[in-house]
Amino acid sequence: MAERTGSKAKVDTVAGESRVEAAEAAALVVREDEDPWTEEELTEVRELLMSDVERLRDEINDAEADIADLLRSGDTGGEDQADTGTKTFEREHEMSLAANHRDMLVQTERALGRIENGTYGVCESCGKPIGKARLQAFPRATLCMTCKQRQERR
């Protein structure tokens, strides 16, 4: 089951960046066989997520610029069907990449929000701890391994 230590702490915000207090880290749920989150561990996860947000926003902007270029080059009358098919494939590929980046951005921002509101590490399906090791490997995780495996079997 879950073990919650400490009490929920306030988060000071300076220039858009949250400062993690030790009590906030200790208040996050962990599995019984895990040590509580330390301030350093939570800061590391938060910084990774914030850098992912910046990277994903840049990648989305780049993909949207590529899509706009592909749409502008569009359908010119002198192209054969192979060229048109290639451009259509490239455009759809860029649109798919942009959509994937947007989904990852939403997941990343959601993980940051869960850290802020103290629900980071709680499985959204069963309410049990996700597991600190899983979150350190995949910080955007919202499901414990059991629930994730169940979801993938469906």
Residue positions per predicted region:
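Short Cys/His-rich "knuckle" micro-motifs
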Residues: 133-137, 154
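Short flexible coil/turn linkers enriched for glycine and charged/polar residues
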Residues: 117-119, 129, 138
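Short, cysteine/histidine-rich loop/knuckle motifs that typically chelate Zn2+
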Residues: 125-126, 146
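Cysteine-rich micro-motifs
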Residues: 141-148
